Amino acid sequence: MVIRQFDEEFWYKGKCYKIGDRIIGTSESEYEGLFGSIFEIRDGEDKETENDTPDIYCDFEAPDDQEEIKHLEDVFSDLYACPKSLDEICLDIVIMAPEMIRVVQTEAELKGKV
């Protein structure tokens, strides 16, 4: 199953994920704290990964804050065991598992106040 239509819903373990939803990366991923959006969901035989969970395709926004940029560069430098700059970190077409993202519901959450 491939879901691409804006506002189309996909339910997984009692949580609703919709195409176009604003999301934030959780502590379960290298993208923790980054905002983005869902643009595609794949499940079953249409998945690209071998994970037991659906593949949720996200585009993330590059951080503006220099401390956040440095933190992201450090995380990916450690992950790849070589220095990585922001320009070298993939922020679009990132396949995430459901536990790696949280849907952002309110304006306060979008501004990072919750």
Regions from the PLM with identified roles:
Residues 2-114:
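Basic/aromatic-rich interaction segments and small domains that mediate binding to polyanionic partners
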